[in-house]
């Protein structure tokens, strides 16, 4: 029995009315659901596509199972039936359904065939009853873990549609389900000893003898996150129109944590000029699925950063993951570089503003044996550029605009996010902060890869073709080269025929005395000024395969010696 009248739903977007009951004995959710879909595509539809990601755990033949196996993990291959998840559909009904079936190619896509076409602007209401067997959370981070439940991607939902194409995306353990923003109204019942935390708003709680029922709702929601925990691990922080629940701050006092949450929230929302209401569940597990590379490789007894600093940047990264997923409407699989690049770009800006003196190796930079090495002078944010270049030198990198299902794990988690983030920083330096903000604001209002590319390719204030075609869309590494022709001229080349705007700087006593911007490779006349050496891109650097040819000393063929190691 459903708990909200369906006619209270908004008429312009998809909506879900859900009644779910958790059985903690057999780790199942029994679900009754009414879902309403509006045809916002550009064609009449003869079928509706649903995504049933809970069923991606059913056996070793699913796309998820193959993905986990391809990443050299045998945990799923040898999992017991009790550890795996599945969906048992009991009924799918509507006055306009001819038939339905599971996709032949994958077990987590459902095709519903209609009796008559659903015209543009028309809606269909579907009632579905099913039971979800929750998986062990060790596979993807979602499901059951001892006595706790981490619920995400368990609801059968409408696949997104852009133009005339259904996404029809299977679960590949990429945390990238891309759904249309929808209205959710839910009643979920469970054993009374559990605490519930969610990105939905809790409207009411009913206590019975042995169970608890919680009524939740939310508008403009991309996906639903619910944690059911034995312990009250989350802290709640409220501002004027924001509510954030997080389990990250364990060392910081409540007052310190509230200050940091407000600072991160205000910084991000100010940058995006966002005054909307916000309800986020910012979990440490979101960070652990994609941590800062390098920090997670350190053994627990080595801690170059204070616990309070680590808590703040872990919260910042997890906040950005959840915030961008909620605010952007692009296909997260096709356009992953936008989500991951913006995440790294904002983190870089935040650390530059509030922690500009924090070093790449933290407190280890003060150890005498390391003081004379370049690594001790590198800032924390330098890790994004350095790890991006590191993967390029290993020749393991892939193009950023390649759909994430084809990226290797090192590219998905490290190289592509860092490369994209550094690229946005470089772009901001070229076109200015306000122009980049305006560009990002426009990105938040589009939902297709074609529109995204056109936004850059048709940009009026500057030629940004290079960014999409040569930087994001090209696997070939950049290699700018500075060559002295004679006493008065230099030549700038790009050895791999990649078109990238650049600047030339003249330095004296390690200070920049003049920079000139260029958009083409050519001979350049050296100005009549007193300088020590010439350098390509002295302010903001791009990932390059070889930077040893980016310098020329004025009075010597020697170049500044840099010793770097990862």
Label the predicted regions.
Residues 197, 280, 435, 464-467, ...:
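Beta-strand-rich binding/interaction modules
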Residues 334, 340-422:
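Acidic/His/Gly-enriched intrinsically disordered linker/tail segments
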Residues 72-91, 104, 108, 127-227, ...:
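Extended, low-hydrophobicity, Ser/Thr/Pro/Gly-biased non-transmembrane segments
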Residues 9-30, 42, 155, 465-466:
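N-terminal, polar/Ser/Thr-rich
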Residues 28-62, 67-75:
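Ligand-binding face of N-terminal immunoglobulin V-set domains in extracellular IgSF glycoproteins
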Residues 404-485:
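Amphipathic alpha-helical substructures
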Residues 58-114, 137-142, 201-209, 281, ...:
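Solvent-exposed beta-strand/loop surfaces of large extracellular or lumenal domains
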Residues 186, 235-338, 342-350, 544:
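Juxtacatalytic substrate-recognition/specificity segment
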């Amino acid at each position: 029995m459903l708990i909200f009248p369906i006619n209270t739903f908004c008429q312009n977007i998809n909506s879900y009315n859900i009644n779910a009951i958790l059985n903690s004995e057999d780790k199942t959710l029994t679900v009754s659901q009414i879902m309403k879909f509006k045809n916002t595509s550009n064609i009449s539809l003869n079928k509706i596509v649903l995504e049933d990601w809970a069923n991606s755990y059913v056996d070793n033949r699913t796309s998820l199972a193959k993905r986990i196996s391809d990443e050299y993990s045998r945990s799923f291959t040898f999992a017991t039936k009790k550890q795996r998840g599945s969906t048992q559909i009991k009924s799918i009904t509507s006055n306009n359904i001819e038939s339905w079936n599971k996709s032949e190619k994958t077990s987590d896509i459902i095709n519903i065939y209609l009796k008559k076409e659903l015209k543009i602007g028309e809606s269909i209401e579907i009632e579905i009853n099913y039971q979800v067997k929750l998986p062990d959370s060790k596979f993807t981070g979602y499901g059951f873990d001892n006595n706790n439940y981490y619920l995400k991607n368990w609801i059968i939902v409408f696949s997104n549609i852009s133009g005339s194409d259904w996404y029809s995306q299977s679960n590949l353990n990429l945390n990238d389900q891309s759904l249309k923003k929808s209205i959710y109204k839910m009643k979920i019942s469970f054993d009374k000893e559990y605490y519930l935390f969610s990105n939905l708003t809790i409207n009411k709680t009913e206590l019975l003898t042995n169970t608890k029922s919680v009524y939740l709702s939310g508008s403009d929601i991309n996906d639903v996150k619910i944690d059911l925990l034995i312990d009250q691990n989350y802290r709640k922080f409220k501002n004027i129109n924001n509510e954030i629940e997080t389990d990250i701050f364990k060392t910081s006092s409540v007052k310190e944590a509230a200050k940091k949450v407000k600072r991160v929230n205000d910084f991000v929302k100010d940058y995006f000029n966002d005054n909307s209401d916000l309800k986020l569940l910012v979990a440490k597990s979101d960070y652990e699925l994609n941590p800062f590379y390098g920090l997670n490789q350190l053994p627990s007894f080595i801690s170059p950063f204070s616990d309070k600093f680590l808590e703040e940047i872990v919260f910042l990264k997890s906040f950005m993951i959840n915030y961008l997923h909620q605010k952007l409407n692009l296909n997260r699989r096709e356009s992953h570089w936008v989500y991951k690049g913006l995440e790294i770009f904002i983190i870089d800006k935040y650390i530059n503003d509030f922690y500009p003196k924090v070093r790449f190796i933290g407190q280890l930079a003060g150890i005498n044996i390391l003081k004379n090495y370049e690594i001790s002078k590198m800032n924390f944010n330098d890790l994004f550029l350095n790890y991006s270049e590191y993967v390029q030198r290993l020749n393991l990198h892939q193009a950023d605009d390649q759909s994430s299902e084809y990226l290797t794990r090192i590219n998905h988690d490290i190289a592509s996010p860092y490369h994209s983030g550094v690229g946005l920083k470089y772009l901001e330096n070229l076109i200015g902060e306000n122009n980049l903000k305006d560009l990002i604001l426009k990105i938040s209002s589009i939902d297709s890869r074609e529109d995204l590319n056109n936004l850059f390719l048709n940009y009026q204030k500057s030629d940004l073709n290079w960014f999409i075609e040569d930087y994001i869309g090209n696997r070939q590494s950049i290699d700018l080269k500075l060559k002295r022709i004679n006493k008065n001229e230099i030549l700038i080349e790009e050895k791999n025929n990649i078109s990238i705007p650049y600047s030339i700087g003249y330095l004296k006593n390690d200070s920049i005395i003049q920079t000139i911007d260029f958009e083409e490779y050519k001979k350049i006349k050296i100005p009549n000024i007193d300088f020590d050496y010439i350098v390509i891109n002295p302010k903001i650097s791009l990932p390059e395969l070889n930077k040893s040819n980016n310098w020329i000393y004025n009075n010597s063929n020697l170049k500044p010696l840099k010793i770097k190691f990862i």
